[in-house]
């Protein structure tokens, strides 16, 4: 005989902060790196995926606009979020930060929406950064669009370099050692305030401390600034002190 047992309902998982993250279908890195930061038991992090192209072009990036509300709508309907992050740097430069926020809010309940571009601008303001060295994996057209958006936000792209890789599956597998070598060549003898590693598919967390020590300047990445900005908007602080000066000091 089956017994009907009593139960009680508690609060939503994550007593202090509730985060949502929209990850590109082609992204293999963002969730892996976020798991290293959003690991406090008092926080919850829910993820959704948005359809994206295998190749990074202005056209494939623009197409994501059509699917963002649907991706946000795949979060639990009853959940209320402090912050939802959209995980695409170049996509933000093409679609626009305000448009992204509007589309995400149509699909879920959240107090704040952010993405790597707004997060980078906020991080640079917090750190007093104006002159950026910019390392990109993208083809020229995509990189130029993003650089123009950053210049319009008051940042000076002092020096720029790119791997010029169009396939997302290859971007996700660029080795950290390749990034260290490229960063050192790019920043050498340049008068910059910080280095920015652009793209949520780049593996950046493991090399931030090493690069800051060798370059003697702050090192920011798409995943790093997005994580920091999401925590900041929620009124939270990171517990990590081994991922660069942004998380450690701000």
Task: Cite the ranges covered by each PLM segment.
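Short, flexible loop segments at boundaries between secondary-structure elements
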Residues: 165-170, 219-239
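Periplasmic-binding protein-like
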Residues: 81-87, 133-135, 192-199
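Short, glycine-/small-residue-rich phosphate/pyrophosphate-handling segment
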Residues: 126-149, 234-250
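Short, acidic/small-residue loops that bind anionic groups at enzyme active sites
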Residues: 101-124, 211-230
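N-terminal glycine-rich anion-binding loop in soluble enzyme alpha/beta folds
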Residues: 2-71, 138-175
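Short, well-structured alpha-helical segments in soluble
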Residues: 63-79, 178-192
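Hydrophobic alpha-helical
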Residues: 180-211, 226-227
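Glycine/small-residue-rich loop that forms an oxyanion/phosphate-binding "nest" at active or ligand-binding sites
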Residues: 71-114
């Amino acid at each position: 005989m089956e017994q009907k047992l009593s139960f009680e309902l508690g609060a939503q998982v994550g007593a202090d902060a509730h985060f949502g993250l929209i990850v590109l279908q082609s992204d293999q890195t963002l969730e892996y790196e976020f798991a290293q930061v959003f690991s406090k038991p008092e926080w919850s992090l829910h993820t959704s995926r948005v359809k994206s192209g295998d190749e990074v072009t202005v056209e494939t990036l623009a197409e994501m606009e059509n699917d963002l509300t649907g991706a946000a709508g795949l979060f639990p309907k009853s959940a209320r979020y402090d912050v939802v992050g959209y995980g695409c740097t170049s996509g933000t430069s093409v679609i626009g930060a305000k448009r992204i926020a509007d589309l995400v809010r149509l699909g879920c309940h959240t107090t704040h929406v952010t993405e790597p571009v707004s997060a980078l601008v906020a991080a640079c303001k917090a750190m007093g950064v104006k002159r950026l060295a910019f390392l990109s994996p993208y083809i020229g057209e995509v990189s130029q669009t993003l650089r123009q958006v950053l210049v319009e936000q008051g940042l000076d792209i002092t020096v720029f370099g790119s791997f010029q890789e169009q396939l997302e599956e290859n971007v996700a597998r660029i080795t950290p050692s390749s990034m260290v070598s490229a960063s050192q060549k790019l920043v050498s003898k340049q008068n910059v305030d910080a280095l920015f590693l652009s793209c949520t598919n780049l593996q950046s967390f493991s090399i931030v401390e090493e690069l800051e020590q060798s370059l003697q300047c702050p090192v920011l990445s798409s995943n790093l600034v997005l994580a920091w900005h999401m925590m900041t908007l929620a009124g939270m602080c990171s517990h990590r002190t081994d991922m660069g000066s942004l998380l450690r000091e701000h």
